[in-house]
């Protein structure tokens, strides 16, 4: 007897969910006209001609702040479900979550000591 028959709906959903975007891209590639020209290669900026060059330098500090923000944002995403079911999970999951937070705090202290969080 096939034991995975309970997942038939899941596999059907997965196949249909995969086929819809593939078919949409395929049909649009089949029906859309392909026109090469200078207008396709020009940049578009709110309907007006762009002024100046498109290459702007920005400080790497913005990147570091964004990276630290993403790390702690992902931490929040992982810790929220744990906090909602804290009373059911027990002490072992609490220790795992504590180790997870401790690793992130060590990373934050490392970034702080390296000067990654200094603005000037």
UniProtKB/Swiss-Prot annotation:
Signal peptide coordinates: none
Membrane topology: Multi-pass membrane protein
Classification via Pfam families: Oxidored_q4
One BP annotation, GO: photosynthesis, light reaction
GO molecular function: NADH dehydrogenase (ubiquinone) activity; quinone binding
GO-annotated cellular components: chloroplast thylakoid membrane; NADH dehydrogenase complex; plastid
Keywords: Chloroplast, Membrane, NAD, NADP, Plastid, Plastoquinone, Quinone, Thylakoid, Translocase, Transmembrane, Transmembrane helix, Transport
Location of the protein in the cell: Plastid, Chloroplast thylakoid membrane
EC numbers on record: 7.1.1.-
Domain of life: Eukaryota
Enzyme class: translocase
Membrane spanning stretches: 9-29, 64-84, 88-108
Annotated catalysed reactions: a plastoquinone + NADH + (n+1) H(+)(in) = a plastoquinol + NAD(+) + n H(+)(out); a plastoquinone + NADPH + (n+1) H(+)(in) = a plastoquinol + NADP(+) + n H(+)(out)
Quaternary structure (record): NDH is composed of at least 16 different subunits, 5 of which are encoded in the nucleus.
HAMAP family (alphabetical): NDH1_NuoA
Family (UniProt): Belongs to the complex I subunit 3 family.
Function: NDH shuttles electrons from NAD(P)H:plastoquinone, via FMN and iron-sulfur (Fe-S) centers, to quinones in the photosynthetic chain and possibly in a chloroplast respiratory chain. The immediate electron acceptor for the enzyme in this species is believed to be plastoquinone. Couples the redox reaction to proton translocation, and thus conserves the redox energy in a proton gradient.
Protein name according to UniProt: NAD(P)H-quinone oxidoreductase subunit 3, chloroplastic
């Amino acid at each position: 007897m096939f034991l995975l028959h309970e997942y038939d709906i899941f596999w059907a959903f997965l196949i249909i969910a995969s086929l819809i975007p593939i078919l949409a891209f395929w049909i649009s590639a089949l029906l859309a006209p392909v026109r090469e020209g200078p207008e396709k290669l020009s940049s578009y900026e709110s309907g007006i001609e762009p002024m100046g060059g498109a290459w702007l330098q920005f400080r790497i500090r913005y990147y570091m702040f964004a990276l630290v923000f993403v790390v702690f944002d992902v931490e929040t995403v992982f810790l929220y479900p744990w906090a909602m079911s804290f009373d059911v999970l027990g002490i072992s999951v609490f220790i795992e979550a504590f180790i997870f937070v401790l690793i992130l705090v060590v990373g934050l202290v490392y970034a702080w000591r390296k000067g990654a969080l200094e603005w000037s």
